[in-house]
């Protein structure tokens, strides 16, 4: 064991030894002699003595250890004391020697004072010169250091170094150094260019011009999972870097002792161990010095910047975090004292940047439509051969209403001289080009081109008519909708950046201003002095200062509402072009005078964009425009927007789309949602609720109404509403007035559309009038306007009601025109009308078994009809009947069409309670789903722009059907909103009244046909007056009037089954068989003589009627059987008598019929007088 090793006492072992000895041996009263005697007397005394010996040995060992430990400590104390005395003696000798040297030094100073002062001054000069040279060397490295920091996007450090460098160059020591003049000028120029660069960086980030800005926008959401995760990583990295910096600041580890400060641990160290520790510490210190010398030299200016800048971390790229990046840029501008001018430059660039973004979006949308060959629906009322520069309202009033407006007279489209115009504007039912369909399909002489035009014109005629499906189809492939989606999406991101940047700028400007005011305040306090305490000053109560009041007085320089106003202004100017708003400055025509005084045409109105429309296309076949080549660029390599038009001298346009006031319908809800969304965002960010001075409000019961009494309309919203009031509504009224007049006044208005053109689109295959289809097409278009602009329901509803009422008046006039000259009109205006209405109400029910007894209505009907023919002096003329089958089918088609129109109008415009509940449930489900999506913090990616190729079509369909994330304000109205439902409820009563009018007129047409066919029976059976039944030879052919009646009823029944449903046809012809049976008996009054051949002829008439009218008299043979049996019995007297005695009773024969039969037998003498007496007796018993 080493002698220098310090020994320690083992207290545990000592305690163990002592505890092993019994307690009685530790007591002071221990009697050793008695204990020894007891041991000696004990039988096991030997064992006891051995045990006592062991105890003694253990105690001796521990006693020796205790003595050794204390003796070693005593020796060390004596040794240390001797060393101390030795050090004290050495120190005393050194002190005496130092005192002698001090005396010698004082003597030298007294004798050489002047020389020492000279050396001291020279030393100061050298020191300051070296310091200046060091500064110059550092300043020469500043440009490279600036470029390094700027390249790494560490602009705050760059700004600090730049400002500190210029400040250093302007110090008194360096201001006159000629070698630094060029550097000073370069840094000043660098400062100005650096300001511009910072503003450009901010602009690029705001308008998402770089990939980094787009990525940064995705992570800026506070609820984004990746953003939070990134913040955690950055905080950990910062903590690690801080720890590393802290450890680097101390050159020696904390456990290492300095070689110049020996430690005393309570015991003297040997000389060898001390030298060993000193050598290890020296080696470690040298290694630290070498590592520091190998690191790059840090400039003093750089150290100053790092100590003053706590926001910027040099280890990360700040551009990955948008908010941090903008904060650092603003901080750099603050260092450069360029905040307010930068705000002015940024606000001044908004208009230019938005115009550029709009132009790029226009070009992109146009190229997408070119490359993908999308088909675009036409404007309502536009014909396929409309000119490129014509107004949208001319298409409906002057041309045959093809496309979505209607059809022309002969049911086909007007031909065009252009080789592509015949099929270019037609849209296939399944979205394919008509040229593709026409290759594989032929229907007679008609091509699928015309069929597709009809299917496109009446796209509402689907098998399952659904309101939401109809609305969803309104925004398919509308370029202006896609353009606004892209612009609104871009503007939404840009405006969010502006909001963040405005808050950062305003806070920085406010802090800077408060700092300036605080400095002024402190300066005034110092110059004015304490003065004296005021009476209002109390101890412990802080006195309000001017600095605190100044916080309220500082206004925001970067006004977000001004940004929003500029954005709305630029979008408004773009919309003016696409809405054909001639009040726009962009489209205004200003005449200019040439130097010679003549008027020039340079101010002629011209379109500014290559993309100029939404709904409309002139000549577009889905793949190529006739006026544009396959490439959207000009032959000289320039784009279509930059090409020069030879006629106007201005920028040429790609003539695919046409501006129209109809474009306001699909974009109005988008604008409303967009403006409401950004207004709400602006209010939430600024915390200043806006109020409005206007008191006009729209009354709705929903909370999400577009018009709120407390909301202020922005510039864009005011413009679109003003445009609707000023132009759009009047344009709609005039346009629909012209189109309506054309639809109801054309020669084809009351002709049905060909059946084969509707059978593949309608589950109900009954033809419908052309005018009815066109009127409902108008209602469809106006209904889409109502849904898009629900708070204009009064205006659009008035147009719908006026159009429907005018059509009702036209149909009523047409009905009266056909019915008034006829006998049907006389019967239709009597009390018979209400009986027939009751019969019509139950006609659709199950028919009972045929009965001979007439009902009260049938008796009344038969009486009124027969009275028309009981006046020989007033014979019925042929012109008092409607024998033209086309007129009869027109009445039938009008009845079905008006009833169909009434049902469709009610289905479209009347909101049922179950539908309203369904909409409410759907909205609640959507809100719950949206809340669940918002509660889940998952990363979301924004769709910037429209993809090219096939992906854009899929994304376009997805965007049309759904709305996601922050783009909820951009979207289509695939479902009716609560506002639209409430708006439609205001129209319920007028629409129900109009629908009832249509149904009443439909019933009048049906009743008129029923009466007309019964009058036909009376008219044709009047032939009995001219017929002769004293035939010399047997005749096998029926009477001519029977043949005519057969032909008339058969043709009518065949045509009516095409135009009317089975229940209505049953109502028309249900009583014909019974009526003819009654007439075949009642007309016997005109037969004065008859022989057996005449009887055979009568039987032939009945057989012919029964055979030819089988479709009409299904299950009604009983009415013809009794007549046939009666006629056949006329051949034999006995058979006749037996038959009449058996059958002459009610209800088989009525009293009137019995009287007519007896009179007929008396005149013709077919039986004996006795038989007649027998029959008369039978008649009396009836």
Swiss-Prot record:
Keyword tags: Cell projection, Cytoplasm, Cytoskeleton, Exocytosis, Protein transport, Transport
Bias (Polar residues): 933-968
Entry's Gene Ontology BP terms: contractile vacuole discharge; exocytosis; Golgi to plasma membrane transport; protein transport; vesicle docking involved in exocytosis; vesicle tethering involved in exocytosis
Localization of this protein: Midbody, Midbody ring; Cell projection; Cytoplasm, Cytoskeleton, Microtubule organizing center, Centrosome
Cellular component GO terms, alphabetical: cell projection; centrosome; exocyst; Flemming body
InterPro entries in UniProt: Sec8/EXOC4, Sec8_exocyst_N, Sec8_M
Domain of life: Eukaryota
Region (Disordered): 236-262, 376-427, 525-545, 921-968
Compositional bias segments (type: Gly residues): 392-409
Bias (Low complexity): 236-250, 410-426, 921-932
Pfam families to which the protein is assigned, alphabetical: Sec8_C (PF20652), Sec8_N (PF04048)
Family, per entry: Belongs to the SEC8 family.
Quaternary structure and partners: The exocyst complex is composed of sec3/exoc1, sec5/exoc2, sec6/exoc3, sec8/exoc4, sec10/exoc5, sec15/exoc6, exo70/exoc7 and exo84/exoc8.
Function: Component of the exocyst complex involved in the docking of exocytic vesicles with fusion sites on the plasma membrane.
Protein name, as recorded: Exocyst complex component 4
Origin species: Dictyostelium discoideum (Social amoeba)
Name of the gene: exoc4
């Amino acid at each position: 064991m080493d002698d220098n090793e310090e020994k320690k006492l083992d207290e545990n072992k000592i305690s163990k030894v002592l505890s092993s000895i019994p307690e009685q041996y530790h007591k002071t009263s221990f009697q050793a002699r008695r204990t020894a005697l007891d041991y000696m007397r004990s039988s096991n005394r030997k064992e006891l003595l051995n045990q006592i010996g062991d105890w003694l040995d253990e105690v001796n060992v521990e006693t020796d250890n205790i003595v050794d430990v204390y003796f070693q400590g005593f020796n060390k104390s004596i040794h240390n004391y001797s060393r101390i005395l030795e050090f004290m003696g050495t120190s005393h000798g050194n002190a005496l020697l130092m005192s002698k040297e001090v005396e010698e030094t004082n003597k030298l100073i007294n004798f050489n004072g002047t020389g020492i002062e000279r050396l001291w001054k020279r030393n100061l000069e050298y020191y300051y010169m070296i310091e200046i040279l060091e500064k110059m060397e550092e300043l020469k490295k500043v440009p490279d250091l600036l470029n390094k920091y700027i390249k790494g996007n560490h602009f705050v450090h760059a700004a600090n170094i730049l400002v500190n460098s210029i400040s250093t160059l302007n110090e008194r020591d360096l201001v006159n150094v000629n070698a630094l003049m060029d550097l000073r000028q370069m840094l000043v120029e660098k400062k100005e260019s650096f300001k511009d660069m910072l503003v450009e960086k901010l602009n690029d980030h705001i308008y998402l011009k770089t990939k980094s800005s787009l990525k940064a926008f995705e992570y800026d959401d506070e609820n984004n999972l990746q953003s939070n995760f990134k913040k955690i990583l950055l905080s950990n990295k910062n903590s690690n870097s801080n720890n590393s910096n802290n450890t680097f600041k101390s050159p020696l580890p904390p456990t290492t002792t300095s070689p110049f400060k020996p430690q005393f641990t309570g015991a003297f160290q040997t000389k060898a161990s001390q030298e060993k520790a000193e050598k290890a510490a020296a080696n470690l210190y040298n290694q630290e010095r070498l590592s520091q010398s190998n690191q790059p030299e840090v400039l003093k200016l750089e150290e100053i910047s790092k100590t003053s800048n706590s926001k910027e971390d040099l280890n990360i790229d700040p551009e990955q975090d948008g908010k941090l990046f903008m904060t650092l840029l603003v901080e750099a501008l603050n260092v450069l004292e360029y905040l307010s001018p930068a705000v002015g430059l940024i606000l001044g660039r908004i208009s230019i940047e938005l115009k550029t973004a709009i132009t790029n979006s226009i070009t992109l949308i146009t190229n997408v439509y070119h490359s993908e060959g999308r088909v675009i629906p036409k404007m309502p009322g536009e014909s396929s051969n409309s000119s490129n520069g014509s107004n949208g309202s001319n298409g409906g009033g002057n041309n045959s209403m093809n496309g979505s407006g209607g059809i022309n007279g002969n049911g086909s489209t007007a031909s065009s001289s252009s080789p592509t115009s015949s099929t270019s504007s037609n849209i296939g039912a399944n979205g394919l080009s008509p040229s593709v369909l026409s290759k594989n399909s032929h229907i007679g002489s008609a091509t699928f081109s015309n069929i597709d035009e009809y299917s496109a014109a009446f796209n509402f005629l689907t098998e399952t008519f659904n309101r939401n499906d109809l609305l969803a189809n309104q925004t398919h492939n509308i370029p202006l909708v896609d353009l606004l989606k892209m612009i609104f999406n871009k503007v939404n991101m840009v405006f969010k950046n502006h909001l963040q940047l405005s808050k950062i700028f305003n806070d920085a400007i406010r802090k800077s201003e408060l700092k300036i005011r605080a400095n002024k305040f402190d300066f005034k306090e110092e110059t004015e002095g304490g003065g004296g305490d005021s009476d209002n000053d109390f101890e412990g109560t802080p006195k309000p200062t001017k600095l605190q009041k100044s916080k309220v007085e500082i206004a925001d320089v970067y006004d977000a509402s001004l940004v929003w106003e500029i954005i709305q202004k630029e979008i408004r100017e773009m919309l003016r072009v696409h809405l054909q708003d001639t009040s726009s400055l962009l489209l205004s025509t200003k005449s200019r005078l040439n130097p010679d005084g003549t008027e020039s045409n340079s101010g002629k109105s011209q379109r500014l964009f290559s993309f100029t429309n939404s709904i409309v296309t002139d000549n577009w076949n889905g793949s190529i425009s006739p006026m544009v080549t396959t490439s959207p660029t000009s032959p000289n390599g320039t784009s279509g927007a930059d090409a020069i038009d030879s006629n106007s001298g201005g920028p040429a346009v790609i003539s695919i789309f046409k501006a129209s006031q109809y474009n306001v319908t699909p974009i109005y809800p988008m604008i409303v949602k967009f403006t409401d969304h950004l207004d709400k965002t602006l209010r939430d960010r600024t915390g200043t609720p806006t109020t409005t001075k206007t008191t006009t409000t729209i009354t709705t019961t929903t909370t999400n109404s577009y018009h709120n009494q407390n909301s202020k309309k922005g510039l864009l919203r005011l413009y679109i509403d003003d445009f609707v009031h000023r132009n759009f509504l009047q344009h709609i009224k005039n346009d629909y007035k012209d189109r309506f007049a054309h639809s109801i006044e054309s020669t084809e208005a009351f002709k049905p559309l060909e059946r084969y053109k509707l059978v593949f689109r309608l589950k109900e295959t009954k033809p419908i009038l052309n005018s009815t289809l066109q009127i409902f097409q108008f209602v469809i278009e106006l209904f889409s306007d109502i849904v898009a602009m629900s708070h204009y329901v009064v205006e659009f509803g008035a147009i719908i009601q006026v159009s429907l009422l005018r059509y009702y008046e036209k149909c009523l006039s047409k009905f009266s025109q056909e019915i008034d000259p006829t006998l049907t009109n006389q019967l239709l205006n009597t009390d018979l009308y209400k009986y027939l209405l009751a019969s019509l109400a139950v006609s659709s029910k199950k028919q009972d078994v045929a009965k001979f007894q007439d009902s009260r209505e049938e008796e009344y009907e038969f009486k009124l009809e027969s009275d028309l023919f009981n006046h020989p002096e007033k014979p019925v003329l042929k012109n008092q009947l409607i024998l033209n089958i086309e007129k009869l089918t027109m009445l039938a088609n009008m009845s079905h069409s008006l009833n169909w129109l009434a049902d469709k109008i009610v289905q479209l415009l009347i909101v049922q309670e179950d539908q309203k509940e369904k909409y409410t449930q759907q909205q609640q489900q959507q809100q719950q789903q949206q809340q669940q999506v918002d509660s889940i913090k998952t990363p979301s990616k924004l769709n910037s722009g429209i993809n090219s190729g096939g992906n854009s079509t899929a994304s376009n369909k997805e965007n049309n059907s759904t709305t996601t994330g922050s783009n909820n304000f951009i979207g289509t109205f695939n479902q009716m909103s609560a506002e639209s439902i409430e708006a439609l409820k205001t129209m319920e009563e007028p629409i129900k009244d109009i629908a009832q009018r249509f149904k009443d007129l439909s019933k009048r047409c049906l009743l008129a046909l029923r009466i007309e066919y019964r009058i036909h029976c009376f008219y044709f059976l009047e032939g009995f007056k001219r017929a002769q039944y004293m035939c010399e030879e047997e005749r096998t052919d029926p009477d001519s009037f029977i043949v005519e009646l057969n032909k008339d009823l058969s043709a009518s029944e065949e045509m009516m089954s095409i135009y009317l449903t089975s229940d209505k046809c049953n109502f028309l012809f249900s009583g014909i068989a019974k009526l003819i049976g009654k007439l075949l008996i009642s007309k016997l009054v005109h037969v004065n003589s008859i022989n057996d051949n005449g009887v055979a002829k009568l039987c032939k008439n009945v057989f012919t009627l029964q055979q030819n009218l089988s479709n009409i008299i299904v299950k009604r043979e009983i009415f013809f059987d009794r007549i046939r049996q009666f006629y056949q019995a006329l051949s034999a007297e006995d058979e006749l008598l037996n038959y009449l005695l058996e059958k002459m009773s009610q209800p088989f024969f009525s009293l009137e019929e019995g009287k007519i039969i007896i009179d007929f037998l008396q005149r013709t003498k077919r039986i004996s007088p006795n038989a007649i007496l027998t029959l008369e007796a039978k008649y009396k018993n009836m």
